[in-house]
């Protein structure tokens, strides 16, 4: 069984609320056939009554929730759990607006709507998928991407390399841009954790939104397609052996 030379896991990212800013982690525990703990656990509806009628249906398509490609005004907002995961904290550009119990979050949605009503079609609601995630696919996968891919995208588009555009869970050290796109079907080991690499992550217009200014003046998605002849950055992966991973852990690929 062939093995690649060992390289490192550079960063771990969790995005507690779909479409909002995330947080970096130093370590996390991963379970078999599960998303990264706390990732996309919550989602905020657009305020549509049609969506609110379907809230008991479980996983729902991203069009029902606020997202960067449709509501760039969400840039700068965070909704994060406290250390005990008993309360949620609403922040805007790092400043706390308010906090409320995780199981009674209506005041948080009222505050968000009051501060920025133009990004909603009505009063939003906070949805929660306990034990699951509001990822773009209903499959319980995580996402990972190579450092060289982020760097090369930045070079081609004249933008700083920034995972906030792509919202990947794991950034791994790579030498060649987009080499990970050829890893489908391979097994990755990070510490005691193993993952099966599944398929590329297709990108949408959300990557056009500047994560600092919320402006989307440049068609970065179009530049990506013209330069690379594809719009993929990152790979989906399925956890096959549980365990703990930490930044700077070394990883290996087997085939």
Predicted regions and their residues:
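Metal-cofactor-dependent catalytic cores
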Residues: 1-255
């Amino acid at each position: 069984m062939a093995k690649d030379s060992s390289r490192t896991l550079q960063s771990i990212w969790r995005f507690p609320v779909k479409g909002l800013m995330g947080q970096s982690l130093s370590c996390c525990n991963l379970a078999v056939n599960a998303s990264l703990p706390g990732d996309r656990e919550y989602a905020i509806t657009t305020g549509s009554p049609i969506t609110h009628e379907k809230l008991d249906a479980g996983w729902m398509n991203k069009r029902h929730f606020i997202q960067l490609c449709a509501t760039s005004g969400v840039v700068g907002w965070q909704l994060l759990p406290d250390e005990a995961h008993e309360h949620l904290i609403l922040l805007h550009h790092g400043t706390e607006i308010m906090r409320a119990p995780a199981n009674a979050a209506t005041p948080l949605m009222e505050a968000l709507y009051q501060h920025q009503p133009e990004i909603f079609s009505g009063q939003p609601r906070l949805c929660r998928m306990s034990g699951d995630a509001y990822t773009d696919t209903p499959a319980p996968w995580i996402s990972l991407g190579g450092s060289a891919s982020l760097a090369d995208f930045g070079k081609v588009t004249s933008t700083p390399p920034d995972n906030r555009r792509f919202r990947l869970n794991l950034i791994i050290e790579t030498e060649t841009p987009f080499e990970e796109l050829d890893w489908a079907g391979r097994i990755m080991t990070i510490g005691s954790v193993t993952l099966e690499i599944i398929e590329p992550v297709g990108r949408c217009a959300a990557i056009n939104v500047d994560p600092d200014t919320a402006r989307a003046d440049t068609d970065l998605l179009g530049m990506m397609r013209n330069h690379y002849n594809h719009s993929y950055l990152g790979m989906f992966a399925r956890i096959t052996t549980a365990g703990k991973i930490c930044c700077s852990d070394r990883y290996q690929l087997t085939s």
